[in-house]
Amino acid sequence: MSGVALGIEIVSVFFLALFLLHRYGDFKKQHKLVIVGTLLAWYLCFLIVFIIPLDVSTTIYNRCVARHAVTPAPSNITVLSPTPGIVSNTTAQNHLPSADKLRSSDNSLEECSKPWSYIPRGIMPIFWRVVYWTSQFLTWILMPFMQSYARSGGFSITGKIKTALIENAIYYGTYLLIFGALLIYVAVNPNLHLEWYQLQTIGIAAANTWGLFLLVLLMGYGLVEIPRSQWNGAKKGYLLMKTYFKAAKLMTEKADAEETLEDVMEEVRKVNECIKYNHPLRKCVDTILKKCPAEYQEKMGRNMDDYEDFEEKNISYPSEKTLVKLHKQVIYAVQRHRRTQVQWSILLEQAFHLEDVAKNETSAAKQFVHTFPHQEPESWIMRRLYTPTIEWYWECLLRPWCSRILAVILALFSTVVVWSECTFFSAKPVLSLFAVFIQQAEQTHNYIYVEVVCFLSIFFLSICVYSTVFRIRVFNYYYLASHHQTDAYSLLFSGMLFCRLTPPLCLNFLGLTHMDVSISHQNIEPTAYTSIMGSLRVLPLIADVFYIYYPMLVLILCIATYFSLGTRCLNLLGFQQFMGDNDMTSDLTDEGKELIKREKRKRQRLEDGETRRREWKERYPTNREDTSRNRSVNSDQKEPTYTEMTTNRSSKYTRASNRTERDRIELLQDAEPLDFNADTFNDDPLDSESGRYQPGGRYLSMSQSNSRIFDDV
């Protein structure tokens, strides 16, 4: 099995990353470079998480072989080679004859069972160098550049590159600042001599220092909030009330995004009417129009008059710099509008599902009934296995208890992590619980247990860190939505974030397990992953101070999160957060409940209309001859005159002579709901009279109506 397990995991992890990217991204609409860059970033990060357990089990086996090697010398220890970070197993047994060496090796193999996932020497260091440096190139250079390049408002490749370099100066400046400070520290220290390997170690330490700084802050929030969210999710009505609260806040943001988009489209319309077809900047305007939504493009295309010349001296034309700024505003406004639309649709589905769960809890039939059908078609396997009865037992009975059990398990896991983060620096006695578990498994040669514990621990820490990023309001610009609804900017941000935080996260975990020799202070073989990080003894300030004591800050952050100190502070600053004992929370919850009711009525009217249309078609089917004859008549029909239009309009309000005609009229009238209001709804994104975009479907009091009495009838 030498190397087979590594090959299997490399292939399996690639297909896992490809499957997840296909679920969240859109291969057809998004740029190929975005897809390839995100896939590579996710793939490398998943490789680190999945291969670290194999590296740990292989290192434990190699240590066992070195420890049980039989030699006539009084001591038999593993010696560190002169080259930093490279470990040599040269011991006193090198002076034995070849037969004694073979006999010593056989005795070692008999006492140390080889793991099923054993990886031969020399493979893992090369593998980790390729994975680590590729991920660092992606997270620090390529992906930030791609992200800024995609948002740039320039119209040429040179302009986009220039803008991307300027915007990424803060990232490059932060990295160079940390690297320069460490470089000055090493240069000033008279006991240290700069070499290429030491410069490489300084660069790695700078990246890991920046990652660990963010890691502890995010982990302190996630270790408490994830178990608490699972526990609160089992409470009746808690998730539904929180969803109502989110709906009210998201609708406010959605309305603001719509207004921003309309304002930007108004500016685009003015520029489009000002710059004609023969203007030198017309290509720039066409590029801006391609980024606009389809309905706005059609309206602007119909209103454009290409026969007017641009050489009128009284008109002031915008400059190229103004168009670049407008182009960037269009990209941001369209992306924000799309994000709020996607998040709103996801939130509606969650609210409808939670309301269905609340209704079905009192059902005597014990069969789960959905108010609306699923948006995505279910597979025949789910339809056969996940029946309404099974769904009722799961959603109404089993799921709350499973959430409570999972919350208790996660809380215990979080306690272990916090305790280990505060005590992992103690080598004698060993206080870190992760180190205790690994050492016990090392004595019994239970490699499966070692790999499972390592994988679950890293997976839990990753969820605590990454889920916190997408929960924080500051990062609400980015989101991950399934069913191909994640935009390119969020995909690039997620890949950049994963590559930036995963290496220091795994290095921190190896420190918790004392697999890092800089923590255990033993002259034993380190893991291949920690060996490529170099000897941090080059930087004693980082190795002995920051890496040891800074993770203890996670305890303070967990206490602050448990008492919701951050939430209360944000609430006082005006950023409304969900708090059960707050009047503003109650008001927003009631407002969100009304919004969900309104959306449910709209969805119900659409469902009823589709049902009546299907029934009408089944009841009065038309044959192919009538259909073909009607098509031929309509194709030869001329434009109707004013008299014909008046006749058709008046016939809508006359009584039908037979039942078929009455059904047809009823079907046509169903297209407009009972509470339809022409003042609040406009199919045209551009109003022909005022020349300004009119929003459709405004929210609550933001939509003005001449008659509001029968709006909700």
Curated annotation (Swiss-Prot):
Entry keyword Membrane: yes
Top-rank lineage group of the source organism: Eukaryota
Glycosylation positions in this chain: 76, 89
Pfam assignment, any one: LMBR1
Polar residues bias locations: 643-657, 701-713
Keyword presence, Transcription: no
Function in brief: May associate with G-protein coupled receptors and regulate downstream signaling pathways.
Protein name: G-protein coupled receptor-associated protein LMBRD2
Organism, as annotated: Xenopus laevis
Source taxonomy: Eukaryota, Metazoa, Chordata, Craniata, Vertebrata
